[in-house]
Amino acid sequence: MAALLLWAGVLHAQGIIAHRGFWKADGAVQNGLVALQAARDASGCRGVECDARLTADSVLVIVHDRDLDGKHIDAMHYHEVARYRNINGETIPTAEAYMQKATLLCDKTFKLFFEIKPAQSQSQRGTYVNQCVELVRRHQMADRTEFISFDLEMCKMLAARCPDIPVAYLGGNRTPEELHALGIDGIDYHYSILLRHPEWIQQAHTLGMSVNAWTVDDKADAQKLSKLGVDWITTNEPVRMGAWLRNEPIYRFISFNIRQSGFPEYDGEHAWPNRKETVVKMIRDEAPDAFGVQEMLPEQRDYLLKHLPEYAMVGVGRDDGHDEGENMAIFYLKKRFRILKEHTFWLSETPDSVSFGWDAACRRTVTEALLQDKRTKSVIDYFNTHLDHVGKVARRESVLLLVRQMEEAAKEGVPVLLSGDMNSSLADTIFTPLFQAEFLPLRWRTPQTDEEDSFNGYGIVSNAFANNTGANVIDHFFAKNLFAIQFKTLVGYYGVPYISDHYPIVVEFSVPAGKKGELPHKESSTKKN
């Protein structure tokens, strides 16, 4: 699934390599063909690393671990390896199948880093070299491939055999001068070694050698290595790494239909008093920078503000523009954001006044908060809503109204995020105007995602949503002008089986740093009767 590249920024100097492919992407496993494709699709990723091993009958396969179900791969015949299924259903690919796929994906902007595992004998070493070089030559991949290995003798043989294909050593126990004298083209060392020996980076560059650091999954380490001037960074987090190296802030937002507290006799054991503490626990555990709620009543608002004092809130009751009725509120971390604008409008023909819209069964509102990061000055225009559960015309017209409002907000490249209980699956045609305006669904367009139901009905499937495939997936995020990193439905246990009749959903994303916002006028931008 392609990464969501919604803002075109200036890329960092370092090339990002997806370690064993982007195996954290939806439906992927380490060294699989899905992970290879996901690495190519990941925003900012410039290369993919894979691991090659020989079977007992000299078939080259792409797999990291030597052991497979308790048996060494080099003691297994290929037909035994081929029977194995990964959790996503993929078989372990042959190097031939992997290279066929890589040939279609690799170009001047995306490179294959082909790790050859250490040989168990000199004879096997020769077989490795012959097969790997012949494989690259046959697929005309010499200009898009780099061989890497912990086996120094293997590196020497490769360098002598194919001087036109770069070779880098992984072992970390040789200086650049020593490797250069052996004809080896680069150092590909664990990041901790390069941080201990930063002089090796300069030495390698002076000798015309490349420098790659592996496996870097920490922002601070990545930024240190970037400042030291490494050429490549291998990581398990290629999309997140791009944001770190661009020095973009990463945010975590939650959308949550909290289930209003007004029906304790109907909710029984799931009534608000029995789950309110677990709602707070969920927020504390997940630590969002901001979260939008649906269905919140005043007593729930007061409870959350009391027990989550680190958050401030914007939003009004839908029935009078003050306290009455459900509130589509936005909570935000006071230490991270300031509010540049807050705005509530009604989903109706008269959006600036308290009103019903079209054939809706309830008044429906949208809360807008223009948030500015206090440190970076980046801005996010965040919209939160709850579409009607009955009125089909109301849902369709509400989306059109939202698109008009959000297109105005996004005109200057401002990142715009919409969350809410939409009472519709993404297959519903009501969302077509959002897609056409390039407000894209993060559930579908984020590399790390899921397709979990978001409506749980306290464990009972509701007849209202049971007729269509995916129809219980009704809580969504849409976005424009940002990089999406991860989407997740929070189905974990926070103290009771269900903290609401909906599961929260969470998205992580980055935005371009330094997008300035202007302070609003002091009067409220929320209009009411």
Spell out what each predicted region is:
Residues 12-269, 282-286:
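Phosphate-group recognition and catalysis centered on beta-loop-alpha active-site segments
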Residues 1-15, 524-529:
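Bacterial Sec-dependent N-terminal signal peptides
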Residues 21-24, 78-84, 255-277, 323, ...:
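Acidic/histidine-rich helix-loop elements
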